[in-house]
Curated annotation (Swiss-Prot):
Organism: Streptococcus agalactiae serotype V (strain ATCC BAA-611 / 2603 V/R)
InterPro entries (UniProt xref): Aldolase_TIM (IPR013785), DeoC (IPR011343), DeoC/FbaB/LacD_aldolase (IPR002915), DeoC_typeI (IPR028581)
Subcellular location: Cytoplasm
UniProt name for this protein: Deoxyribose-phosphate aldolase
A Gene Ontology molecular function term of the record: deoxyribose-phosphate aldolase activity
Pathway noted in the entry: Carbohydrate degradation; 2-deoxy-D-ribose 1-phosphate degradation; D-glyceraldehyde 3-phosphate and acetaldehyde from 2-deoxy-alpha-D-ribose 1-phosphate: step 2/2
Catalysed reactions, as listed in the record: 2-deoxy-D-ribose 5-phosphate = D-glyceraldehyde 3-phosphate + acetaldehyde
Parts of the chain that traverse the membrane: none
Record-stated family: Belongs to the DeoC/FbaB aldolase family. DeoC type 1 subfamily.
Top EC class of this enzyme: lyase
CDD domains xrefs: DeoC
Active site: D91 (proton donor/acceptor), K153 (schiff-base intermediate with acetaldehyde), K182 (proton donor/acceptor)
Amino acid sequence: MEVKDILKTVDHTLLATTATWPEIQTILDDAMAYETASACIPASYVKKAAEYVSGKLAICTVIGFPNGYSTTAAKVFECQDAIKNGADEIDMVINLTDVKNGDFDTVEEEIRQIKAACQDHILKVIVETCQLTKEELIELCGVVTRSGADFIKTSTGFSTAGATFEDVEVMAKYVGEGVKIKAAGGISSLEDAEKFIALGASRLGTSRIIKIVKNQKVEEGTY
């Protein structure tokens, strides 16, 4: 698989709590230069970022992040506010307390409400796979499919672990037609990125791939 094809799947990500505007600018510049799928940044930077890229790059942001236990009304407002400010894609975190209580209907209804708030914008649902049993993950594949969301996403990158090959395999087997998979968290090599894609992921959330590509270009004397 060519590097440029891997880069097209990447949501180039900076969600650090201490991220500065110059750091966000670098993320945006690199994402545009390497033609990634989007740049994923904190909601507080969305308006400024959207103005900065001026339609040359999709802007993704996160809501209910990273713990997911804010109310549905709060998440809906976050979504509407982000879109008003120029976000093209929304990555939401589900409420894991509902999952652990076995209340999957509430999880589904929340996703439906946020999808309605997204209108025609892309919605990715973060299920935080490292906190789930296999049975819970399988159930959530059905929930996300029925909800009308566009993607199921493995991880926030802020919990105990990120994406695993095994979890993406489960998602690919049990998610419904029309729902795509985003693997995120801990993707640190082009080889891993390619394997996640081969297993069924069509988006990768990572901050490292562009750095790897840059280093390769330096080593090859082409950058």
